[in-house]
Amino acid sequence: MSYRQLGFIFFLILPFFVSAQTSTQLSASEIKLGLKKLNTLGSALYIAAHPDDENTRLLAFLAKDKNFRTGYLSLTRGDGGQNLIGNEQSELLGLIRTQELLAARRMDGAEQFFSRAVDFGFSKTSDETFRIWDKEQILADAVWVIRKFKPDLIITRFPEDSRAGHGQHAASAIIAREAFIAAANPKRFPEQLKYVQTWQAKRIVWNTYNFGSLNTTSESQMKLDVGKFNPLLGKSYGEIAAESRTNHKSQGFGSAKQRGQAFEYFIHTEGDEAKTDIFEGINTKWNRLVEGEKIENMLKEAELNFTVDNPAMSVPALVNIYKALSSLPDTYWKAQKMLELKEIIAAAAGLWFESYTLQPIQTLGDSIHLRSEIVLQSSVPVKLIRVNKQILNIELKEGIAKTILSSIQANEISEPYWLVNNHPQGMFDIKDQLLVGYPEKRSTALIDFIISIGGQEISYQRPAEYKFTDQVRGEIYQPLIVAPAITASIADKAYVFPGNTPKTIQVLLKSFRDKSSGTLIPKIP
């Protein structure tokens, strides 16, 4: 069976192995936190080797206290790890651990990235690791993520030497340092520059650790208290970190919540050396953008006047900020803040919209019948201009849900993009450069909602999902799955042929349509 078939078949049952999602809407305190984040133009990227290597406490602090755009680049998907919740190994385990990382990021507020490296199991040294990994290709992937994400600060979990305790750990630190340098060099991986620009991060540091038997921390190192309490969330970052880390269920990483002071320690690796604070010299103000100061002042005023009892009162000011931001020259930070701002506007206005199907599996080439629902939960005047190609021009009324029926074509099979092609031991084979780094391929079943609010048209996209109500768990959302019309698999994993004696092989066919017919022609090797 090919990796592509393996990935697709498991994709059908993956929802049973990961935590089902429920859709949520931002609370007033989360909207206020979002306003603070809007006024912070800083970013940090954490780099390590595997799922569960990341420091969730530091990620939560960076994302929710410093309000940085925060990411974690795991070079592998953890294919070579243990599995305490099932029998899945190798690529199937990598699928599970990918979902565990995404669940963890939903808790701590960071974003998730991967390279094409395969976790092939334990290795003693980085040299041994690079005999199996294609170092140059993985370096290119890390450079690609850095050039797209544009971090001001890069942080590694491990050192480059034997203290890392694992060859892949040490290799991740080497890749991170070399990528920090190469990302700024236009002569390195120039083929990427038709999509992205070079990027020079301010510095790269090593986040040292005390793992009990191995303590690499010292009071002479830069340190940062990440154990603070966030009153807007009602939690400390130690509590958020435990909730995040507990999602690594296949590794048995259920974690106790920690409260109170907690220090992280850092050693300078490359770039502008900081003396006492890893954030030294990083400009997080709007003056990074031409005419950005006016946006900063408008956001400060919006935050000052924000009322938790009635977030909708802030909508006119937020729409004015959106208009002002739209007029600025196109930059990375303009695009990022436009995305953040329009979600804050929708949340403050009490706008809820979604698109879903009642069928768990769709068939390639068929029409997917969707229900799109939108409801306004405030008195803010909002007009629904269109949903996809349906022109509506409807004035939404407070508390009255509007349902729109539509259909889209199921034009692409749901499958993990990194398993489409067969691959060697150490590397996934990914043909499309634009997919590199993503945890999953973005859904092609995206529904456009165009609204008019405060005289400004704003476009939103929501993925079409499968929604159902479970008698025990309640309302559940799962990814919409598109399957081929028919799949075929061999009943047994292996057959023994003694001599030239023929054997009967059972082939299992499954149709994802009500009625299917055809002829099965086996290709004998």
Where are these regions (language model features)?
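Acidic, serine/threonine- and proline-rich intrinsically disordered appendage/tail regions
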Residues: 439-513
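Beta-strand-rich binding/interaction modules
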Residues: 367-394, 402-407, 415-418, 445-450, ...
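Active-site rim/loop-helix segments in enzyme catalytic domains that contact anionic ligands
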Residues: 21-148, 170, 177-181
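Eukaryote-biased detector of low-complexity, proline/serine/threonine-rich segments
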Residues: 398-463
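Bacterial N-terminal signal peptides
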Residues: 7-17
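Low-complexity, acidic Ser/Thr/Pro/Gly-rich terminal tails and inter-domain linkers that flank the onset
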Residues: 322-365, 466-500
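Metal-dependent de-N-acetylase/amidase catalytic core
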Residues: 2-3, 20-44, 125-129, 135-353
